[in-house]
Amino acid sequence: MATYQVRLINKKRNLDITLPVDEDTTVLEAAEEAELDLPFSCHSGACSSCVGKVVEGEINQDDQTFLDEEQVAKGFVLLCVTYPRTDCTIRTHQEAYLV
């Protein structure tokens, strides 16, 4: 099983941490295991509480049902159903930027 280095960043919240995330673990699950306080609600990809934005790297979020194609194309991801496929950097707390 592959493990990737996922960097979570947010300047406003003074957040910059890199977590090892297994390919079959969501980014939110890994963050919770590391006791990070990230927003979430449904844990099923059906809301926008845990939205982040991929700055670098590749992910899989095929299970999400909330984001539209344009939002996905802009790099928005739902951390509760986001699985890393490479080392990546994700900006957290991006719900206010969904338009």
Curated annotation (Swiss-Prot):
Keywords: 2Fe-2S, Electron transport, Iron, Iron-sulfur, Metal-binding, Nitrogen fixation, Transport. GO terms for molecular function: 2 iron, 2 sulfur cluster binding; electron transfer activity; metal ion binding. Its cofactor is [2Fe-2S] cluster. Residues 4-96 form the 2Fe-2S ferredoxin-type domain. [2Fe-2S] cluster binds at C42, C47, C50, C80. InterPro entries: 2Fe-2S_ferredoxin-like_sf (IPR036010), 2Fe-2S_ferredoxin-type (IPR001041), 2Fe2S_fd_BS (IPR006058), Beta-grasp_dom_sf (IPR012675), Fd_pln (IPR010241). Binds 1 [2Fe-2S] cluster. The keyword Ligase does not apply. Ferredoxins are iron-sulfur proteins that transfer electrons in a wide variety of metabolic reactions. Donates electrons to the nitrogenase. Belongs to the 2Fe2S plant-type ferredoxin family. This is Ferredoxin-2. The gene is fdxH.
